[in-house]
Amino acid sequence: MPNPLRKIFRIEVVCVAALIALLIFAGSLFIQRSRSSAEAQTLQERHARLRAAMDRNDQSEAESLLRGMITNDPDAFARNNYDYLLARLLQNRRAGAEAGTFFLRVVNRNSPLAGYALWHLAEIARDRGAYPEEQKLLGKFVSQSGDHLLRDRAIERLADSYFKTGHYHYAIDTLQLLPRSRRVALAKIGEAQLAMRRTEEARRTFEAALANGSLDDASLRACAGLDRIDAATGTVLTEAEALRRASVYQFNRSFTEARRHYLILLNNFPQSRKRAEAMFQIGRGYFLDNDFVEAAKWYDRVHDEYPRTEEGEQGFYYVGHCHQSLGDWMRAIARYEAFLKEYPNSDYFGYAHLNAIDTLRSARRFEDALAWAARAQSNGNNPFTVVNGLFQEAKIRMTQGDYAEALARFTALRSRNLNVRGLTATTNAPEVAFMRAYCLEQLGRFDEAIDEYLALPELREGAAGYYGHRASERLRDLGGDSYAGVLVATRRDAFITQARAARAQGAVEAMKSAANQALRFATGATIRDEMLRILRDAYSRLPGYQLPKISIPEVGRTAPIESAATPPSDDSHQTIAGELLFLGLYDEGAPELLQTPIAKSDYAISLPCARGGCASRTVKFSEPLLRSLPEDYRPELLPLEVAEIFYPFPYRDSLARHAAPRGVDPRFALSIARQETRYNPREKSVSAARGLMQFIASTANQIAAQLGLRDFEQDDLYNPDTAILFGSQYMKNLFAEFGSSQAVAASYNGSEDSVRRWIARAGDNDVDRLVIEIAKRETKDYVFKVINFYNAYQAIYPST
């Protein structure tokens, strides 16, 4: 008799099998429908999604879309050079082998982008240390490149590769392809000749590189080469030659080599008229190398031997700085006191008072510092000294916790002329107004403090712009106080009500004023959006708030090439620019565009350059337009394309790759770069700082060691990606020590030691106490500018 349980089991198995079959069928149907949906998307639609991902720098999404496009339409993928874009994205994430396969496809079909593909294949080979392969690829590029934009760079890179493998004759032949005007190439030819022991040829080549009297990188290489030759041959330098080489080394901060040549002048030419200069520069070199003991010796010597010269006067003064830097407070004070007696009419008279007071403050001798401050205030014949004395006393009182006396001094400063020569080294009107509010806040006089903070409007530039934004930040902080928060909320709500009422009445100026003030407080997103709408409405009705007319034409093609069309095959700059910009590769497309007739139009190239590697051109064009706008025009209300021109965001890939992983906000790094060089990657300053992020040699060498870069050369800093890597690492170090953006900006410009000294002098980590302690005019102005840029970038690009 059959088992009923077995029958039931068979029925269940059949049912389960049927259910599985149904699920498989449904799944296949879903897949087919999904595939059909993807195929139904037009090439134009897929390209639009791809460009949107590229424009927001979502490289992961862009790569995913590109891989889907390979499957959907491989012919269109090649026809539109999407394989080149995919290769670039793969190279960015260090997938060099796979990137190479796609670059090779571009080369093999002789695409207009074949030259760029060869360049990147050579980069991949170089990263692997495969120099023979790199040389083969670059040699092919140079032989086929014609007037390619990368041709000279390829020649330089090929010569460098030959240097690394010891093929100096090939390096010379390669460098000779460059114009004679490229003096760095000339100096490198001399180095290759010297390596081949063609000494006299090398000497003539180095002399030719030095002939125009410049102090630049080419001259530095030439001097180093000549010194190697002279050391081997025992050549004795003339006075003029010793001074020439010393000047080149000193400018480039090669202080050891500079000192050696200054000593030749001092030891061999006792009657030289340049002896005072040589002594002073030796002292300066030691000082900038932080060897303050040796610096003081040389500064004293130049004063002792040449007291009535400019070098003697400055040397006597700078000895005080040496003692101050060594923490030898009493000797520093004695030197400043002696300087005031010996040089009562010196341009440094007021600064000697300032430094004497600062030294006493560092020594925590506050009563003596107050006595010096009073002495400075009594010098009615020198307005700078009087104002400096008042400002110093205010800072001392704050350090002592006596905010009432500090408030009195800041109040006295309000009635003073703060525009006397040199006063930007100490303080300014917005700073004085802000510090009055700060003191009122510390005294618990919140009502008055809030009013004074509100009296400092949010502006874009200068000390006024910086302190307006700092006032808003203090207001938001006060909103969290149990007592002051009630007062803050009352003011905020009043401004919101006023803005709404003014809009209802059509009172445009009142709308603008009230909405601007309301936005300074912490509000919810709904209220903030409402106030911005009111402000936008006010701008539209105020003649002074109309944006300058910026017509941004389309450049490059915008539509993908369909199957029936023939892709472009020529390698003109116009075609290459069009293909690169079509792919969203502004870093290469914008410089190509500058080689076309359209480059004559600042309007046409402003947006591509803002996104690419020529943002310095955009800034040069846009800064006058930005200055034509009212100072209180809020950056976040600019249309995005206009905002990008006023505040470009170039080098997104490098910033995302190097800054963000190190905990550095890319927008802050960008603000530093803007202030340092206006985004010019080839910049070299009078302080011999190189590249986009302006590194001097000593700091660059320290960062290279941290990063484990063994083959680093100073010229590498002219590569924007390398500069951003170094800048990001350096800023990471600074943030780890100092914390605040203001302190990091001050360190970047004025040195870590200076910031440590200013923080110690303030006796407080409060950022507002630090900023008023910044004693260097250039550094304080630098902080204002960087933070103002940072505020604008945060407003325009709320996420990175």
Model-predicted regions and their roles:
Residues 2-667, 673-675, 679-686, 693, ...:
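Acidic, polar-rich low-complexity tracts and alpha-helical solenoid repeat scaffolds
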Residues 452, 459, 606-609, 617, ...:
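Catalytic and substrate-binding regions of cell-wall glycan-acting enzymes that process beta-1,4-linked
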Residues 571, 644-650, 714-724, 776-778:
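Active-site metal-coordination segments of metallo-dependent hydrolases
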Residues 664-671, 738-745:
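Acidic/histidine metal-binding catalytic segments
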Residues 677-723:
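Peptidoglycan-targeting cell-wall enzymes and recognition modules
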